Amino acid sequence: MPELPEVEVVRRGLAAHVTGRTISAVRVHHPRAVRRHEAGPADLTARLLDSVITGTGRRGKYLWLTLGDGSAVVVHLGMSGQMLLGPVRNENHLRIAVLLDDGTALSFVDQRTFGGWMLADLVTVDGSDVPAPVAHIARDPLDPLFDRAAVVNVLRRKHSEIKRQLLDQTVVSGIGNIYADESLWRAKINGARLASGVSKAKLAELLDAATDVMTDALAQGGTSFDSLYVNVNGESGYFDRSLDAYGREGEPCRRCGAIMRRDKFMNRSSFYCPRCQPRPRV
């Protein structure tokens, strides 16, 4: 699933091309793509037609297009959603097609159909306007108003695994399995440690590591392991070449040379160095 850097790459690409444009045509090709919009495809189409896109926004893994009437198109990419500008190469997975007043085609393509669009009102939360369905999502480490000290205090009160807390979007958003493992590796913390047992200084270091690794990933267009994640031009990111932990089971740690390991975690996997990131004693 795309994480913060991948979604931000898409947001930036959209911002440069759709801001200020008017929607002149909309077609929903698959009803599942708008299943979160309770009023249905016809309502979404009617409300989008002739709307002006006034900007783009993102919090964590959620992306949205703000409209002139004060509402927003909330986009969740799911496992394989793509927001593409220009002609679509494979229309088999085209779910929503939008035509802008300058002739630009904006398409939502989703092979697995886990993602989707919905319309929602904007609400003000802690001084920022966000779509109502996103109001419960915490700020992410790249948000200018991200409060590291406050998040550290929240984590210190959590008597559960630190990696589980990194993935909790109500604590800190935007971090998924890949960047959680990368952040934990950089901070030399095993994800199985209890958050409450990690010092405030070390938790601050971990959040700084998350900020740094996602900034690095953003600079390289995000992480693409297959063709499912691409930017608005259909191009893959290449941060997968720079990963230090994720997917490196059986390879030497880039820092100490120990052989990287993989453990099962929440129907996923955790990758770590047994020397730099020793598991907590039971």
Swiss-Prot record:
InterPro entries, alphabetized: DNA_glyclase/AP_lyase_DNA-bd (IPR015886), DNA_glyclase_Znf_dom_DNA_BS (IPR015887), Formamido-pyr_DNA_Glyclase (IPR020629), FPG_cat (IPR012319), MutM-like_N-ter (IPR035937), Ribosomal_uS13-like_H2TH (IPR010979), Znf_DNA_glyclase/AP_lyase (IPR000214), Znf_FPG/IleRS (IPR010663)
A molecular-function term among this protein's GO annotations: zinc ion binding
Keywords recorded for this protein, A-Z: DNA damage, DNA repair, DNA-binding, Glycosidase, Hydrolase, Lyase, Metal-binding, Multifunctional enzyme, Zinc, Zinc-finger
GO BP terms: base-excision repair
Active-site annotation: 2-3, 61, 268
Catalytic reaction annotation: Hydrolysis of DNA containing ring-opened 7-methylguanine residues, releasing 2,6-diamino-4-hydroxy-5-(N-methyl)formamidopyrimidine; 2'-deoxyribonucleotide-(2'-deoxyribose 5'-phosphate)-2'-deoxyribonucleotide-DNA = a 3'-end 2'-deoxyribonucleotide-(2,3-dehydro-2,3-deoxyribose 5'-phosphate)-DNA + a 5'-end 5'-phospho-2'-deoxyribonucleoside-DNA + H(+)
Cited SUPFAM superfamilies: Glucocorticoid receptor-like (DNA-binding domain) (SSF57716), N-terminal domain of MutM-like DNA repair proteins (SSF81624), S13-like H2TH domain (SSF46946)
Chain coiled-coil ranges: none
Pfam family, one: Fapy_DNA_glyco
Cross-referenced SMART domains: Fapy_DNA_glyco, H2TH
FPG-type zinc finger span: 244-278
Binding site for DNA: 93, 112, 158
EC number assigned by the record: 3.2.2.23, 4.2.99.18
Details of cofactor binding: Binds 1 zinc ion per subunit.
Cofactors, names only: Zn(2+)
Described purpose of this protein according to its UniProt entry: Involved in base excision repair of DNA damaged by oxidation or by mutagenic agents. Acts as a DNA glycosylase that recognizes and removes damaged bases. Has a preference for oxidized purines, such as 7,8-dihydro-8-oxoguanine (8-oxoG). Has AP (apurinic/apyrimidinic) lyase activity and introduces nicks in the DNA strand. Cleaves the DNA backbone by beta-delta elimination to generate a single-strand break at the site of the removed base with both 3'- and 5'-phosphates.
Subunit organization: Monomer.
Family stated for the protein in its record: Belongs to the FPG family.
Protein name: Formamidopyrimidine-DNA glycosylase
Gene coding for it: mutM
